[in-house]
Amino acid sequence: MSYLVAHPLRVLACLIAMACGARAEEAKEATSTADQSKVTVGATLMSDYIYRGISYSAHQPSVAAYVDAQQGWLYGYTNFNSVKFSTSPAVEVTVAAGIRPTLGPFEFDIGAAYYYYPGEQGPDLSNYWEAHATLSHKVTDKLSWGPTIAYAPDVWQSGAWGVYGAGTLAYELPSEFLPTGLTWSLSLDFGRWLFGPTSGAGGVSAAGGGLALPAFNNWHAGLKFSYQVFKLGLNYTDTSLSKENCYVLTGDLGATPGGVANPGDNPLGLRSRLCGATFSATLGFEFNPLTLGR
């Protein structure tokens, strides 16, 4: 596994130096160009990189760096995240683009993302793209909720389509008793990922051709603390996947025998621990470089 840590950490160090020079609160946009434009630069250290309930870092620390640029409704987003897959990619690169219109208390995000895993070992690759639509409804100044739907025609190049649906509820908790400038919020998520039959081995999946990848539910509860440009997250995640189906879905190289064998997709009864209940923490920052020095 080429587990990319050194280069993201260098990026992280440079971004922290920039963030520390930012103002405690971003100034209001001073020009019409700034009014229409927004750029967010950030980085995050994670005790475990969890995506839809599955550990993408094999329950090891991970680091991410990202840039999000928006002009009016249009936006583009790029994220680099260290991962640990069975195909040993150097890093996960996510490139997304779309529109984010606002209608009263409703905010929309409609776009597509491409997940790229350079440096994978073996003949099977995991790169794929996914279209998504998200709605966020701000019920009050502190309470918001919204659904998400996403579709991928070929998840991990396995030949299987994937449809993901989720709902999110977020609430900003009272902060009067906290130090000045410190806020905290609670978020709850529940999602379900459905898959079609595979046509090949796929990049990370252990499922053979013609077999459907195991569908599953996932859920998350998190607390996020924010102070100026810095953010701390405490998270609990879990899925409905059995350890045997977790192996089928992830192809985990650290899977162990002793489970229930399935002649179709898991004849050895291998068990993976990448999809179970997990507590994790994140520490990061984000800021708008367009407002530096204002």
Where are these regions (language model features)?
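Short loop/turn motifs that connect adjacent beta-strands in outer-membrane beta-barrel proteins
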Residues: 25-38, 87, 102-107, 123, ...
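Short glycine/proline- and aromatic-enriched beta-strand/turn motifs that initiate or cap beta-hairpins
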Residues: 27-84, 288
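Residues that define the transmembrane beta-barrel architecture of outer-membrane proteins
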Residues: 37, 59-63, 89-93, 106, ...
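Transmembrane beta-strands of outer-membrane beta-barrel proteins
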Residues: 39-43, 65, 72-78, 95, ...
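Transmembrane beta-strands of outer-membrane beta-barrel pores
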Residues: 45-51, 71-73, 80-84, 101, ...
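Detector for outer-membrane/organellar transmembrane beta-barrel domains
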Residues: 128-211, 236, 289, 293-294
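Outer-membrane beta-barrel "beta-signal"
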Residues: 171, 227-230, 256-257, 261, ...
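Solvent-exposed loop segments that connect transmembrane elements
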Residues: 196-212, 243-271
